[in-house]
UniProtKB/Swiss-Prot annotation:
Domain of life: Bacteria
Keyword Transmembrane found: no
UniProt entry keywords in alphabetical sequence: Menaquinone biosynthesis, Methyltransferase, S-adenosyl-L-methionine, Transferase, Ubiquinone biosynthesis
EC number per UniProt: 2.1.1.163, 2.1.1.201
Function: Methyltransferase required for the conversion of demethylmenaquinol (DMKH2) to menaquinol (MKH2) and the conversion of 2-polyprenyl-6-methoxy-1,4-benzoquinol (DDMQH2) to 2-polyprenyl-3-methyl-6-methoxy-1,4-benzoquinol (DMQH2).
Gene source species: Pseudomonas fluorescens (strain Pf0-1)
InterPro entries the record matches: SAM-dependent_MTases_sf (IPR029063), UbiE/COQ5_MeTrFase (IPR004033), UbiE/COQ5_MeTrFase_CS (IPR023576)
Disulfide bonds: none
Pathway info: Quinol/quinone metabolism; menaquinone biosynthesis; menaquinol from 1,4-dihydroxy-2-naphthoate: step 2/2; Cofactor biosynthesis; ubiquinone biosynthesis
Protein's UniProt name: Ubiquinone/menaquinone biosynthesis C-methyltransferase UbiE
GO terms, molecular function: 2-methoxy-6-polyprenyl-1,4-benzoquinol methyltransferase activity; demethylmenaquinone methyltransferase activity
Residues that, per the record, bind S-adenosyl-L-methionine: 79, 100, 128-129
Gene field: ubiE
Top-level EC class: transferase
NCBIfam families linked: MenG_MenH_UbiE, PRK00216.1-1, PRK00216.1-5
């Protein structure tokens, strides 16, 4: 959690993986990780999840309720998996904004979508989830897939997402979570802390970034805690769905 102090005048700290760092340094450290992995992000996602990330994202799209003419914000949109699908759903009368705080990831996403002809109804914005640069009551749907765990002040980000949603608009948070049984949890720990860094070393020559990613998953709030955080931020009808025995959870909330 944030706001851990060693003294009354000390800067608040937050976790970066299993380490505590000053809050002012976390965004820069996370940026370094994603600058490092951006070029091979899609390849590593496929390898590390066995392609399952595509099924998880498909389920999120199905629950989004997005239709023609909608305005959608895809936060931490990265290489554009969700944006590509939403672009087809909203059609020429709708709009999708792919927002990412990381310039390298945003460039990869822009280039990838332009290469497959997705451009007319898509806008690319470098933006901080905690301080979204959009008007109040602007979007029909906001999504953040595998990005919330990297945000320093998650409560601020959730409130910012609520602000930019229209009344009745939906927030979907797709994120790694806590396995629902002990056997899966032990197997997942072994996989995350041994296999993931090894693959990072072999494919990207960067084991440390993938060690951070494994640690960041463990530090992320569990399913019930994130549900409570969304309720506290002001969302109604908050529910979540566990996938792959809780390795991933999809949370959904509605703006009143």
């Amino acid at each position: 959690m944030t706001d851990q102090r060693k003294g009354s005048d000390a800067e608040p700290t937050t976790h970066f993986g299993f380490k505590n760092v000053p809050e002012s340094q976390k965004a820069e450290k996370v940026a370094e990780v994603f600058h490092s992995v951006a070029a091979k992000y899609d390849l590593m996602n496929d390898l590390l999840s066995g392609g399952m990330h595509r099924l998880w994202k498909r389920f999120a799209i199905e629950l989004s309720g997005v239709r023609a003419g909608n305005r959608v914000l895809d936060i931490a949109g990265g290489t554009g998996d969700l944006t590509k699908k939403f672009s087809h759903l909203v059609g020429p009368t709708g709009q999708v904004v792919l927002a990412d705080i990381n310039e390298s990831m945003l460039k990869v996403g822009r280039d990838r979508l332009l290469d497959v002809g997705v451009s007319g109804n898509v806008e690319f914005v470098q933006a901080d989830a905690e301080k979204l640069p959009f008007p109040d009551n602007h979007f029909d749907c906001v999504t953040i897939a595998f990005g919330l765990r990297n945000v320093t002040h998650k409560e601020d980000a959730l409130r910012s997402m609520l602000r930019v949603l229209k009344p009745g608009g939906r927030l979907l948070v797709l994120e790694f979570s806590k396995p629902t049984n002990a056997l899966m949890s032990k197997a997942y720990d072994a996989y995350s802390f041994a296999f993931m860094p090894l693959m990072g070393k072999l494919i990207t020559n960067d084991s440390e970034s993938y060690r951070y990613l494994a640690e960041s998953i463990r530090m992320h709030p569990n399913q019930e805690t994130l549900k409570s955080m969304m309720v506290d931020a002001g969302f109604d009808r908050v529910t979540y769905h566990n996938m792959t025995a809780g390795i991933v959870a999809l949370h959904r909330g509605i703006k009143p």
